[in-house]
Amino acid sequence: MGRIHATGARKKYVHRDNLDIASFGERPRAWLLEHDFIPQELRQSWISITEQALQGVRHCYERAGDLRLLRLHGDCHTGNLLWTDQGPHFVDFDDSRMGPAIQDLWMLLSGDRAEMSRQLTDVLAGYESFFEFDQRELYLLEALRTLRLLHYSAWLAMRWEDPAFPMAFPWFNTVRYWQDRILELREQVALMDEPPLWPI
């Protein structure tokens, strides 16, 4: 990933959106509300927690300061990482856009806070062999996770009239789905108030 980012930092995209609070948070939230996807009995709770979540995201961005944006993979999780005898290969670049480098690193981490700190240490050791990482970006880790939650719900909702989507995602657009998202966002609000994850 360090090599990909070293290349990605050379030029900017002209025709792709940035990964930012507006495109991944504010606009998806507005779309879901305008199209009445939130069950009426949960609507006020969802409105309230998404407002709090976006305030938390903005605060994380303020703490991080002015950061370099580069061309990202954009959806870098282990399902998009294939290992061969020649090493790792990244696939599925259709979500590539401009954004902070941490977007392509945080989804590689899993487990509790201590485990993620250890994993982050290993990831950055390899990454910085090829490209420098600005540690201020660690303030964005939970903010980007929060934006992904909002964006993904809207992404599914925007495609819900496609007959393939209800078959592929039967759990979406149920009361239980939105209850779970409200709980997740409450957890994210708390996590964004904590000190950033740090390599050990």
Task: Name what the model sees in each region.
Residues 1-45, 69, 168-169:
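A cross-family kinase active-site recognition segment
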Residues 4, 58-105, 200:
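Active-site acidic catalytic loop and adjacent metal/ATP-binding pocket
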Residues 16, 135-145:
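All-alpha amphipathic helical-bundle segments outside canonical DNA-binding/catalytic cores
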Residues 22-25, 144-154:
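Hydrophobic alpha-helical segments that form the core
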Residues 22-32, 128-134, 171-188:
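Short, mixed-charge aromatic SLiMs
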Residues 36-37, 154-200:
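ATP/Mg2+ or Mg2+-diphosphate-binding catalytic cores
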Residues 45-60:
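Mechanochemical coupling/switch segment within NTP-driven translocation systems
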Residues 101-132, 148-164:
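Active-site activation/catalytic loop segments of kinase-like enzymes and analogous catalytic loops
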